[in-house]
């Protein structure tokens, strides 16, 4: 079970073999359920969206960057899926910064202009807030209400959001696994966008199966796991790949070097001087404060923060 320590079995017993057999049986059941779901979706009729409205055209024209060829191709494929009879189930693969979020925003707005609600499911609280700000800013000039749900929204604020969602006053809701909770009720859900589906646990995916049966689904990922790709390759899911980087984007440089304080100082100083941020990954919580102190000593002007899995939600935020 996720979130619990594995049980140690006594040697010379059949306990481990029994556990393996149960796991194999459960995996087969899940695989069969998924295949049934995808077969049902392929053979069922979903909502057929209307051709693009003038608002859709205005939204896409207001994009401040030039669309890449793969962005245009993926957007067109998604529109054809949404305007078709069968429920959409498309996987969009692309590196970070290659424009997947813009594609998702266009798909979401297309659903909204046909009076449908959109759920955007993300794996982390911080990402839900980032997406909320991005969607809200991008759609601020259009008739579209965007809101969010995560563990930081509680009390009256959460109750109000849930009521607005059920009444249909919210067009796009962005959230973590809380979006598949028992209290969530949609008036007219038409599109589900899932960001990095492989990062969700089994319990969330089981709930997703019931939601996805008759709803268009768009999955975004930068790192698809083999099973996700396999579903696309076998035809259960349609696949769009974004390979072309945005104009003037430099490729990511990866260097492997021995630990050296001068290299760390120079790299951090350079990034800060150009207005950027640095993500320094350390592999032990026990001495992470000492590492933060080292960075502060090397680059006195830097503002250094610490984040790890033993901090509570408020501290991380």
List PLM regions with ranges.
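Inter-lobe coupling/hinge segments of SF2-like helicase ATPases
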Residues: 47, 61, 65, 73-76, ...
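Upstream accessory/linker segments immediately N-terminal to the RecA-like ATPase cores of bacterial MutS
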Residues: 1-70
């Amino acid at each position: 079970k996720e979130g619990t320590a594995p049980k140690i079995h006594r040697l010379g017993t059949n306990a481990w073999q029994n556990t393996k057999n149960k796991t194999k049986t459960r995996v087969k059941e899940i695989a069969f359920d998924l295949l049934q779901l995808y077969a049902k979706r392929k053979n069922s009729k979903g909502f057929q969206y209307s051709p693009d409205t003038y608002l859709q055209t205005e939204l896409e024209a207001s994009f401040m960057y030039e669309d890449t060829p793969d962005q245009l191709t993926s957007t067109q494929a998604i529109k054809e899926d949404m305007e078709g009879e069968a429920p959409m189930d498309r996987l969009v693969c692309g590196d970070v910064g290659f424009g997947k979020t813009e594609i998702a925003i266009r798909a979401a707005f297309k659903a909204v202009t046909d009076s449908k609600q959109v759920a955007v499911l993300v794996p982390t609280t911080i990402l839900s807030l980032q997406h909320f700000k991005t969607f809200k800013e991008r759609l601020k000039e259009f008739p579209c209400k965007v809101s969010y749900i995560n563990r930081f929204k509680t009390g009256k604020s959460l109750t109000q959001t849930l009521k607005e969602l059920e009444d249909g006053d919210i067009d796009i809701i962005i959230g973590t696994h809380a979006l598949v909770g028992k209290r969530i009720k949609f008036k007219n859900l038409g599109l589900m966008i899932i960001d990095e589906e492989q990062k969700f646990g089994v319990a969330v995916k089981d709930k997703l199966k019931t939601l996805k049966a008759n709803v268009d689904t768009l999955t975004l990922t930068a790192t698809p796991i083999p099973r996700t790709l396999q579903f696309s390759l076998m035809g259960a899911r349609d696949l769009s790949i974004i390979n072309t980087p945005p104009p003037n984007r430099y490729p990511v440089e990866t260097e492997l070097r021995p630990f050296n304080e001068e290299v760390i100082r120079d790299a951090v100083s350079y990034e800060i001087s150009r207005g950027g941020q640095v993500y320094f990954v350390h592999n032990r919580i026990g001495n992470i404060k000492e590492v933060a102190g080292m960075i502060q000593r090397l680059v006195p002007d830097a503002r250094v923060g610490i984040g790890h899995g033993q901090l509570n939600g408020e501290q991380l935020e």
